[in-house]
């Protein structure tokens, strides 16, 4: 074990913990039992938007093979956190345009001739239960975020890295510079859980990412219990939301961009997301 790279060691330890937790809580591999019942009392539960990746969220995105592109899970997770803070009123600077990787789509730059009217972005968009303006407001936010982190729109889904939410939100959206992208393998399980709990306790929902053998997914942690179960907002319009152990992130189904699998590998998180408090950039290196 000592000769293995630290990230591999961290991954193996995470798998070991996942197996042990499964035995402890009686997890079985039946599809009806893929998510655990919540254990412990709720310590903090933040109210976050139950948003998704399709209409109305994607109505300003490019049409690919006759259909609007998905917003992308990373963009949806970022938008959910921004809606929680209701910040900013307007972006700053000019978000540069770019060319997507998969399809070479030319995406135009974003100029700030618009503001965000958070009161017109409801926490839940029910089918035929929102106004045209409410649809436009959330779609505008998704478009801006996608351009900001250079979303790679494709017919099968939209790719983007949560790393760029940490670096670009302070630049264009007035978020604190202390926002940081963190890899789980750099921390012990206890340290990582305490870090996530502290963020939520400080009223900062966490953008969290996990992978399986085929793909990854970004979502939001917005609560936790005394037994270290975390409330997960999967970014699927409320579908599959619930409490999960961080070593057993196995939703009972899948929404837009998902693949009906677990997300237990290669965890990372964006912490410190909050309106500008005068903080400074933090080096993402732990000694």
Segments the model singles out, each with a brief description of its role:
Residues 151-167, 171-182:
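Beta-propeller domains
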Residues 171-233:
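Active-site-adjacent substructure of cysteine-protease-like catalytic cores
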Residues 1-158, 225:
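Active-site-adjacent structural segments surrounding the nucleophilic cysteine of cysteine proteases
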Residues 69, 74-81, 161, 165-169, ...:
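Stable alpha-helical elements in mature extracytoplasmic
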């Amino acid at each position: 074990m000592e000769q293995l790279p630290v990230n591999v060691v961290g991954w193996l330890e995470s798998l070991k913990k996942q197996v042990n937790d499964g035995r402890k809580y009686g997890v079985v591999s039946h599809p009806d039992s893929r998510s655990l019942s919540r254990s412990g009392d709720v310590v903090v539960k933040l109210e976050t938007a139950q948003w998704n990746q399709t209409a109305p969220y994607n109505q300003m995105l490019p049409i690919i093979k006759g259909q609007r592109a998905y917003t992308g899970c990373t963009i949806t997770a970022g938008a959910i956190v921004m809606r929680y803070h209701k910040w900013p009123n307007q972006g700053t600077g000019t978000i540069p345009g770019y060319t997507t990787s998969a399809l070479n789509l030319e995406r135009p730059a974003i100029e700030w001739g618009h503001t965000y009217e958070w009161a017109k972005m409801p926490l839940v968009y029910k089918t035929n239960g929102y106004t045209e303006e409410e649809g436009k407001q959330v779609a505008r936010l998704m478009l801006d975020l996608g351009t900001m982190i250079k979303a790679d729109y494709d017919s099968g889904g939209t790719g983007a890295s949560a790393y760029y939410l940490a670096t670009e939100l302070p630049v264009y959206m007035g978020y604190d510079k202390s926002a940081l992208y963190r890899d789980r393998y750099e921390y012990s399980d206890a340290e990582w859980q305490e870090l996530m709990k502290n963020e939520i306790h400080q009223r900062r929902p966490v953008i969290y990412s996990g992978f399986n053998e085929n793909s990854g997914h970004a979502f939001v942690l917005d609560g936790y219990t005394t037994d270290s179960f975390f409330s997960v907002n999967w970014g699927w319009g409320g579908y599959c939301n619930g409490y999960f152990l961080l070593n057993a992130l196995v939703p009972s189904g899948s929404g837009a961009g998902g693949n009906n699998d677990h997300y237990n590998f290669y965890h990372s998180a964006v912490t410190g997301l909050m309106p500008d408090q005068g903080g400074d950039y933090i080096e993402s290196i732990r000694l």
